[in-house]
Amino acid sequence: MPLKWKTSSPAIWKFPVPVLKTSRSTPLSPAYISLVEEEDQHMKLSLGGSEMGLSSHLQSSKAGPTRIFTSNTHSSVVLQGFDQLRLEGLLCDVTLMPGDTDDAFPVHRVMMASASDYFKAMFTGGMKEQDLMCIKLHGVSKVGLRKIIDFIYTAKLSLNMDNLQDTLEAASFLQILPVLDFCKVFLISGVTLDNCVEVGRIANTYNLTEVDKYVNSFVLKNFPALLSTGEFLKLPFERLAFVLSSNSLKHCTELELFKATCRWLRLEEPRMDFAAKLMKNIRFPLMTPQELINYVQTVDFMRTDNTCVNLLLEASNYQMMPYMQPVMQSDRTAIRSDTTHLVTLGGVLRQQLVVSKELRMYDEKAHEWKSLAPMDAPRYQHGIAVIGNFLYVVGGQSNYDTKGKTAVDTVFRFDPRYNKWMQVASLNEKRTFFHLSALKGYLYAVGGRNAAGELPTVECYNPRTNEWTYVAKMSEPHYGHAGTVYGGVMYISGGITHDTFQKELMCFDPDTDKWIQKAPMTTVRGLHCMCTVGERLYVIGGNHFRGTSDYDDVLSCEYYSPILDQWTPIAAMLRGQSDVGVAVFENKIYVVGGYSWNNRCMVEIVQKYDPDKDEWHKVFDLPESLGGIRACTLTVFPPEETTPSPSRESPLSAP
């Protein structure tokens, strides 16, 4: 069927060939020629004060100075000359005939061979056509052949939907790559809701990869609008399966996708063979139990097809075990989002020392912070960790207290798929100023302090049972320490023990339930941060006791090699930050907020460290100064503004 296009005017595509400004027969009078000196021994040639499109370059040789002249109009003159010879039937040495008619197109072999590898091989490779005066091109239509010949002789191509497919066929057959590129641009520039399916068909037929990718992107972006048109039902199975499996599909619920897929399947009986394959891409575990019972289980093939029955059982089991969901993740339980962001949580505000309960994500494209669902209660000095893209918030404090006397034991879990929080089992001990790591599907809360004092104990949370249990404790109580994981074990560095800053590094192996001492840091520090990039464990910032009655920022940073058991210094921070949030995003380390002891205030700064370049940069700020804040990366649904509906008409206009 013909594509619907907004304009019937053809698009005219041109190669950048200079336009001839002077007659070829016009004699050049020396009186009107002048050379204008330029830099680097270049000159422009002018005629009567007007630039002629000529340039020259001075070279030295044994024969003396040699000036090389270049005409910027020569190629245009030659091309126009050949085209005029063709139109007048002069010096043509071969006639081309399309496969669908007996029309004849006299051309010059040298022109065709210079523009096409196909013709070059035909006329120079010893093929039988090399000596023929008339050649029939089966597989090339009259319209397509005319377009190709016109382009070769003029560098211009006129395209519209009536001649597009003929032109594509000819360009593909004759290997005229510039024409193929123009056809791709023409198709991409004119995709609409009404023709996207047909454009996709053309892209697949002629193996136009760029066009096919663009159609996929267009359909994904506009799928909700496409569902309301008849074009949706014309989608081929492969493209529909791609869309349903994509994390980039937005603004559609799983129930809407299920109903739409059922419509597509029932349009034609043979399509029912695709039912199981398509239903594997519907995320049934993300539907509500009511939706599954009322709308899914009532569909006949969902009860009779073995694959579909198992999909329903999977969804039912998943929903029956909410605490286990982080360790039951699969493609069908994952959030439909393709954007991972830097996320911050809690902290104490610089003004009034009020504790925050805000959960925010940084939008890299918009260069701004956006709010997600806040916690039920404020938190700072808490621990956060991610399992299966679920964010756990553990312990901390709801009120500002530097001694940790108001530590809490409550634990909450954030589900970015629904932008909601739920409470899970509490810690066995209240703790703040501690470290929390996610390791092998478990959470480990290490040390800290509370109203009873400093803690050496370590607790492990099992999402499968929703319980916290004690594991091997540290040899000494620690608070204000930092930690990270690498190679299936957890590393804890620095911190404070009995009011003394430490530089030791300890390693906990959950398989043996033992702590092992490793090479100490080169600098004592506490309230610092730690993270893993590749095979390096980075220790950043923090503070230490000055020796009198005050503290200093630690600007120096270093990394630990578990393989070598040694530390290496790296570039120092630009500004001191203690009690911060830290996250690794796209192999860069982001240090967020915190407290600067040298400036005696909470800070809003976010600094980024590039391990490859060993460089620090200030990248952006928090909305407010926050100490005791925490950070991580999370795949979320960004809060989005309303986007305009896609056009049903082509935006194409002829240039």
UniProtKB/Swiss-Prot annotation:
UniProt keyword annotations, A-Z: Cell cycle, Cell division, Kelch repeat, Mitosis, Repeat, Ubl conjugation pathway
Gene3D superfamilies per the UniProt record, alphabetical: 1.25.40.420, Kelch-type beta propeller (2.120.10.80), Potassium Channel Kv1.1, Chain A (3.30.710.10)
One function term, GO molecular function aspect: cullin family protein binding
Domain spans labelled BTB: 92-161
Pathway annotation: Protein modification; protein ubiquitination
Source organism superkingdom: Eukaryota
GO cellular component entries: Cul3-RING ubiquitin ligase complex; cytosol
Keyword Repeat recorded: yes
InterPro entries: BACK, BTB-kelch_protein, BTB/POZ_dom, Kelch-typ_b-propeller, Kelch_1, SKP1/BTB/POZ_sf
Protein role: Substrate-specific adapter of a BCR (BTB-CUL3-RBX1) E3 ubiquitin-protein ligase complex required for mitotic progression and cytokinesis. The BCR(KLHL9-KLHL13) E3 ubiquitin ligase complex mediates the ubiquitination of AURKB and controls the dynamic behavior of AURKB on mitotic chromosomes and thereby coordinates faithful mitotic progression and completion of cytokinesis.
Name this polypeptide is given: Kelch-like protein 13
Species of the source: Homo sapiens
Gene expressing this chain: KLHL13
